Swiss-Prot record:
Protein family per UniProt: Belongs to the IspH family.
The encoding gene: ispH
Protein name in the entry: 4-hydroxy-3-methylbut-2-enyl diphosphate reductase
Residues the entry annotates as binding [4Fe-4S] cluster: C37, C121, C219
Source organism (scientific name): Rhodococcus erythropolis (strain PR4 / NBRC 100887)
Ranges where the record places region Disordered: 1-24
Superkingdom of this protein's organism: Bacteria
Length: 337
C-alpha cells in the first residue's frame, strides 16, 4: 500500500530544545506524506464523475469526506448533502460517503427506489467484512472507535448483536462479553495508533484470550501521517495541522504532535485561521494535513508563513504512497487518469 523509504528527515538537529534555538533562521518542516489518501481521492472523484455523468443535483449521505473546503466546493457544483436517505427524493441518485454505511441504510435507500453509488473506502469495507465474518462465527466484537462517528456506526451496523463500541482506554472497564474465549477487537481506521494500542492492552488485561484482527485495521495513510509528524515534532516550536474539526485523523495529528514533543500544535481549515500570535518567538514550524485535505489548503499556509519570514521549507519524508483505488464500477469508464 505504501512503500517505506529510509528516513529523509531534512532536519538539521540541535542538541537544544526548539524553544532554546533562538539564533537559528526561521524554517518550515513539511511532513511527507500528508493530505489526500487513496480512499479520499477515490470518494471525491466518485462524486465529481457522478456529476459529469448524471448532472446535478446528486445527493450524498453525510459529508463525502470530513473537510469543509471539499464539501463547500462540491455544494457549489450542485451536490446536496443530507443526513439520512428520507431527505432524498424518490428515484434520485445517492452517493454513500467514504466512511461507509450500515446494511440498514442500504435497505432504506432501496425502499425509496434510490439509485446508489457506494464511495466507501475499500479499507473501511475490509473492516465491515471482518465484522460480518466474526459475527457469523459468534464472536463478541470489541470495536475500538469514537461513538457517533459515521464509520463506527456503519461497521457496528453490520453486526449490531455482536459489536460493542469501545471509545478509548477509559471505556474498557464497562465492557462485558458473553464468552471470554471468543472475543476479537477491530478498530475505526482513523484512530491514533498509540491510543488504540493502549486500549487493546487494557482490553487484553481484562480478556487474556482477546484475538487480534486478521490484518491491521488502522489504515496505512493514518499511520504514515502520524509517523511523519512524530519524526518532525521534537524539532518544532509549533505544528500546524490543516484539517477540519470533525476529521478524526486530523484531530489525532494534533494530539500526536503534542505527544511527540512539539511545543504547541493547532488545527486550522484555512490559512486565514492561523493566529499570528502563535508565531511569536517561533523558529521552526511543522506543517501537515489530514487525509481529507486538498494540497491547495496546505499551500495557503506555506504562503502565509513565507510572508512572515518562514522561507526555508524542508521536507520530512518518512514514506512514499503509491496506492490508487479503482472507482466504483458504475464510474470506471469515466476515469481519465
Amino acid at each position: 500500500m505504501s512503500s517505506a523509504v529510509p528516513l529523509n528527515l531534512g532536519i538539521a538537529h540541535s542538541a537544544d530544545s526548539p524553544s532554546t534555538r533562538k539564533g537559528s533562521a526561521k524554517r518550515v518542516l513539511l511532513a511527507e506524506p500528508r493530505g489526500y489518501c487513496a480512499g479520499v481521492d477515490r470518494a471525491v472523484e466518485t462524486v465529481e464523475k457522478a456529476l459529469e455523468k448524471h448532472g446535478a443535483p446528486i445527493y450524498v449521505r453525510k459529508e463525502i469526506v470530513h473537510n469543509r473546503h471539499v464539501v463547500e466546493t462540491l455544494e457549489d457544483q450542485g451536490v446536496i448533502f443530507v443526513d439520512e436517505t428520507d431527505e432524498v427524493p424518490e428515484g434520485s441518485l445517492l452517493v454513500f460517503s467514504a466512511h461507509g454505511v450500515s446494511p440498514a441504510v442500504h435497505d432504506s435507500a432501496a425502499e425509496r427506489n434510490l439509485r446508489t453509488i457506494d464511495a466507501t473506502c475499500p479499507l473501511v469495507t475490509k473492516v465491515h467484512q471482518e465484522a460480518k465474518r466474526f459475527a457469523r462465527d459468534d464472536y463478541d466484537i470489541l470495536l475500538i472507535g469514537h461513538e457517533g462517528h459515521e464509520e463506527v456506526e456503519g461497521t457496528a451496523g453490520e453486526a449490531p448483536d455482536h459489536v460493542t463500541i469501545v471509545d478509548g482506554p477509559d471505556s474498557v472497564d464497562a465492557v462485558t462479553v458473553r464468552d471470554e474465549s471468543k472475543v476479537i477487537w477491530l478498530s475505526q481506521t482513523t484512530l491514533s495508533v498509540d491510543e488504540t494500542m493502549q486500549t487493546v492492552a487494557r482490553l487484553r488485561e481484562r480478556f487474556p484470550n482477546l484475538q487480534d484482527p486478521p490484518s491491521d485495521d488502522i489504515c496505512y495513510a493514518t499511520q504514515n501521517r502520524q509517523v511523519a509528524v512524530k519524526a518532525m515534532a521534537p524539532e518544532c516550536d509549533l505544528v500546524i495541522v490543516v484539517g477540519s474539526r470533525n476529521s478524526s485523523n486530523s484531530v489525532r495529528l494534533v494530539e500526536v504532535a503534542l505527544g511527540a514533543g512539539a511545543a504547541a500544535s493547532y488545527l486550522v481549515d484555512y490559512a486565514r485561521e492561523v493566529d499570528l500570535a502563535w508565531l511569536e518567538g517561533v523558529q521552526t514550524v511543522g506543517i501537515t494535513s489530514g487525509a481529507s485535505v486538498p494540497e491547495v489548503l496546505v499551500r495557503g499556509v506555506i504562503e502565509l508563513l513565507a510572508e512572515h519570514g518562514y522561507n526555508d521549507v524542508q521536507p520530512v519524508t518518512t514514506a512514499n504512497e503509491t496506492l490508487v483505488f479503482a472507482l466504483p464500477r458504475e464510474l470506471r469508464a469515466a476515469r481519465t487518469s
